[in-house]
């Protein structure tokens, strides 16, 4: 199972093509739209979310509500395109139009300058349009398909924010996916402890007034994953490595950890490893889950716990200094539409990206031409594990 995305932030539409989804998976546009709506929510979101109300159109790979094994094409129309039609036109246009919305002042923290240098662009909008977080719309759409597949295999996933701009969010250690959905899933801040919500909203409002932005840390948990996904035999087959790569590929994400993560480096081994236990009804389990569900690059049957660090959004209404690429004179960086924070939305992106990697791994490991075949293969594998 693999996918590609295409489209620019202010272009006519965004597109994703997914190949390798088993035939026979029940799938509707509404399944995907639910996730797209979640991505557009959250406290601190601004202008673009008022313009766009994302709705997916499925144009291939699904017939009469079921996947048919061929590539699935997903399209999301950019409603704001009507205001950018000439500026973003595929055909050549007059020079005066080309100069409209031309970007020559790269924004610190964005791809603008390095992208312009790499591809020899005189207009940095060519970089901005594709490097924009708008692309994550389609990663969420792809993730929605993956989550539907995982649900059929009794694998569930959820996320919540555990640190908001340096402020720790209180939550118990042994959180289930259901716990997260019933708390953070109903919060516009995506936090477990709603008693901290009002203080955080005031904090975000202060940041916005100051023309600044904040980041934070998001935790995603996956339940129902059988032991043995991934492999220790080659570096590129380790599933935690694949998840880590996918998470840091999300716009503005700068770090990732599993279980205790970086805290593990501060403790002796006796306080880090999870002791192995066995029982007649559950088979092999662990006494704790400080390694976040991974050993040797493979799932160990415990809950997968992964955290991603999101830097503050680099587009500031109180812009930092930059250099104009035409004149080489110092200027305050260009300002595009921005939000004080996008942590709750980024959590939705991370959740769907992790779901996609897990679904890919399952489809790679097991026979998966059809959903029936995949269900049988997974059930047979779980039975074998239980007898070990």
From Swiss-Prot:
Pfam families: Chorismate_synt (PF01264)
Recorded metabolic or biological pathway in which this protein acts: Metabolic intermediate biosynthesis; chorismate biosynthesis; chorismate from D-erythrose 4-phosphate and phosphoenolpyruvate: step 7/7
Cofactor annotation remark: Reduced FMN (FMNH(2)).
GO biological process, one term: amino acid biosynthetic process
Binding residues annotated for FMN, in chain numbering: 130-132, 251-252, 296, 311-315, 337
EC number of this enzyme: 4.2.3.5
Record key words, sorted: Amino-acid biosynthesis, Aromatic amino acid biosynthesis, FAD, Flavoprotein, FMN, Lyase, NADP
NADP in keyword set: yes
Required cofactor(s): FMNH2
A single MF term (Gene Ontology): chorismate synthase activity
InterPro entries: Chorismate_synth, Chorismate_synth_AroC_sf, Chorismate_synthase_CS
Catalytic activity: 5-O-(1-carboxyvinyl)-3-phosphoshikimate = chorismate + phosphate
Amino acids binding NADP(+): 39, 45
Tagged with keyword Signal: no
Function: This reaction introduces a second double bond into the aromatic ring system.
Family according to the record: Belongs to the chorismate synthase family.
The protein's name in its UniProt record: Chorismate synthase
């Amino acid at each position: 199972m693999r996918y590609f995305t295409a489209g620019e932030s202010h272009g006519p539409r965004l597109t994703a093509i997914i190949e390798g989804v088993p035939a026979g998976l029940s799938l509707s546009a509404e399944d995907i739209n639910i996730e797209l709506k979640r991505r557009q929510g959250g406290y601190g979101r601004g202008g673009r979310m008022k313009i766009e109300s994302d709705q997916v159109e499925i144009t291939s790979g699904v017939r009469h509500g079921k996947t048919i094994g061929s590539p699935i094409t997903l399209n999301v129309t950019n409603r704001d395109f009507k205001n950018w039609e000439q500026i973003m036109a595929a055909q050549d246009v007059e020079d005066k139009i080309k100069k409209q919305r031309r970007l020559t002042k790269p924004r610190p923290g964005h791809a603008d300058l390095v992208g312009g240098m790499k591809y020899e662009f005189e207009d940095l909008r060519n970089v901005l349009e594709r490097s924009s977080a708008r692309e994550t719309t389609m990663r969420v759409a792809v993730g929605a398909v993956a989550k539907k597949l995982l649900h059929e295999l009794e694998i569930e996933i959820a996320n919540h924010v555990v640190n908001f701009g340096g402020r720790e969010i209180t939550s118990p250690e042994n959180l289930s996916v259901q716990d997260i959905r019933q708390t953070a899933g109903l919060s516009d801040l995506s936090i477990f402890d709603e008693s901290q919500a009002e203080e955080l909203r005031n904090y975000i409002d202060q940041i916005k007034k100051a023309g600044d932005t904040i980041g934070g840390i998001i935790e995603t948990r996956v339940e129902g994953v059988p032991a043995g996904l991934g492999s220790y035999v080659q570096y590129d087959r380790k599933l935690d490595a694949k998840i880590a790569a996918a998470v840091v590929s999300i716009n503005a994400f700068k770090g990732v950890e599993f279980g205790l993560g970086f805290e593990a480096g501060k403790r002796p081994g006796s306080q880090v490893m999870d002791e192995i236990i066995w029982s007649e009804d559950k088979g092999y389990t662990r006494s704790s889950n400080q390694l976040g569900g991974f050993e040797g690059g493979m799932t160990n049957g415990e809950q997968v716990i992964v955290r991603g660090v999101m830097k503050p959004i680099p587009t500031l209404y109180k812009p930092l200094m930059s250099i104009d690429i035409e004149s080489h004179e110092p200027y305050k960086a260009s300002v595009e539409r921005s939000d004080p924070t996008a942590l709750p939305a980024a959590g939705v992106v991370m959740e769907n990206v992790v779901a996609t990697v897990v679904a890919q791994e399952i489809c790679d490991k097991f026979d998966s031409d059809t959903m029936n075949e995949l269900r049988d293969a997974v059930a047979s594998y779980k039975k074998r594990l239980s007898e070990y």
